[in-house]
């Protein structure tokens, strides 16, 4: 069923009056219903990045080890031994609020396709999740659905979920964030790209059949939520991980031949986006015959087929003489294979259905010449200095509260639902180290992987928060001994039409840029998710960062577990500020002050020292300092190693719980050598304790048993999920 095309319909589809007038000018006539649908999804924020492209161009994307940066399906970096790592992070926020299980599951499926479409076998999944307040009535249901969706899809496909992070905050009550990251490995000289070439070459559809699920999903992801959000369930796609597994194997088998000229997954905006992007990048036209599209529902019209976001589908341009080879491979894997069109020299996308031309649109205005806005920005006001904050409970009592608080408590309930070791290459499992470590099959080397962001810092000062997210990612890779190579970003923000939101976005980009430049840590891929608001209430600005590093020897990867007899050396100083700290929020009940400053030169200097010490074999365990500060980090190491510690540091609650940056705890039997190396590198360092016994002993405090800390640490999520 179609309707007459009017301004009112265009606005329903997400276009504003000026954009609709632009469509009329481009077409020289009123567009058809299908043409309007194509314009609306291609010009949505989700596909066009029309509010963010101006700012994203400021991020550094080049380095000698970067093979492909932003613009392809995923980023590609040289990791040595003739191999490339291909990785990206992407959001599935809006679908995961409406239908948590399928929203999260198809988020995993979509990011897997972005990676294997470039020729990589996926070797690891990670995620970054933000949920509402633990006491909000929807939070438990959303956590349950999201975690089951991620685990169900990843486990069935056979790709380990090796790491991630979780935050809780009331700003996510009506808008959880589900950011999924996949990493794959490919020969660096066998990377497959999406630019179509060769007028007359066939356009091939492979994978699952097309249904009505997900229609206008890209448009739904480009608007904020209201009271009718539950009615948007039909715009959430339905995933089938078993078909995805078959699709991975079939595509990789075909990629071992010389049949493929270009390949693209059908993600947001489905067949529309994949065909427009492939032809647009290649500078050719494309003609589609929708009668040939495999369909699983009867009576689908052109609009529905072009905008469906049914999962597990790919579009390819093949060499005509290799078409039979490709067909045989996909039929062997019991997947649909159909010739649905060909490339032309018109520079247009032409869509035919039942002998009727349903769409004929020039490609450039849909892609490269899509609307681009430099929206007004308002800077986030600087927070007033915090001043002195009294300690109302004491050091020991605060630790028992913090170690079990929502943002610090163990995530075991979550990661136990993920298969983190399928494939047999996982060296460091969730919770065992600051970053996941995955061995490169057939070599001694390994990848280190992590996701990081501190949204409360970003809300207080987006520029500092953006820099801190990149710096913490770099620290976590460093803490396992990896050389950090590159990042992927997932920019989760509110309504870009509000100047204060665009001000947050622009400032976060500035902070990220400075951190990436100072740390030689380029951005090679990413995703922007805007309109994360419900009934006018926006999320905390959340520029999630996914980081990738490489270790020359997987066996040298450092964990965070203490063992008896190790000295504890603090790299950096004790805490000096409580601004935006978890101590301030959980103990004092406040969320004010500026976040801790980020000294990027110190980050570089301190991290390079730590990595050097790990490579010299002088570090038995290492943990970066972040949420909760120094004492929480030591407690986490004690819990991981089932070992206590006697601490010698003299300090107040600011010293123990301040969240100053550029800091690590090193556990070592070479403390004198570590301190000498730190002095030579102009890095502050001090001996602050020794691992022994079964209690954590802080000067002036009653000892706390590690067993008690573990019990508190493990209790939060099981208790939350057991509530009725």
Curated annotation (Swiss-Prot):
Binding site residues for Mg(2+) 2: 114, 265
Assigned EC number: 6.3.5.3
Molecular functions (GO terms): ATP binding; magnesium ion binding; phosphoribosylformylglycinamidine synthase activity
Record's catalysed reaction(s): N(2)-formyl-N(1)-(5-phospho-beta-D-ribosyl)glycinamide + L-glutamine + ATP + H2O = 2-formamido-N(1)-(5-O-phospho-beta-D-ribosyl)acetamidine + L-glutamate + ADP + phosphate + H(+)
Known pathway: Purine metabolism; IMP biosynthesis via de novo pathway; 5-amino-1-(5-phospho-D-ribosyl)imidazole from N(2)-formyl-N(1)-(5-phospho-D-ribosyl)glycinamide: step 1/2
Binding site for Mg(2+) 1: 90, 527
Localization per record: Cytoplasm
Chain segments annotated as coiled-coil in the UniProt record: none
GO cellular component labels: cytoplasm
CDD domains assigned: PurL_repeat1 (cd02203), PurL_repeat2 (cd02204)
Keywords associated with the record: ATP-binding, Cytoplasm, Ligase, Magnesium, Metal-binding, Nucleotide-binding, Purine biosynthesis
UniProt GO BP: 'de novo' IMP biosynthetic process
Function according to Swiss-Prot or TrEMBL: Part of the phosphoribosylformylglycinamidine synthase complex involved in the purines biosynthetic pathway. Catalyzes the ATP-dependent conversion of formylglycinamide ribonucleotide (FGAR) and glutamine to yield formylglycinamidine ribonucleotide (FGAM) and glutamate. The FGAM synthase complex is composed of three subunits. PurQ produces an ammonia molecule by converting glutamine to glutamate. PurL transfers the ammonia molecule to FGAR to form FGAM in an ATP-dependent manner.
Family: Belongs to the FGAMS family.
Subunit structure and binding partners: Monomer. Part of the FGAM synthase complex composed of 1 PurL, 1 PurQ and 2 PurS subunits.
Record's protein name: Phosphoribosylformylglycinamidine synthase subunit PurL
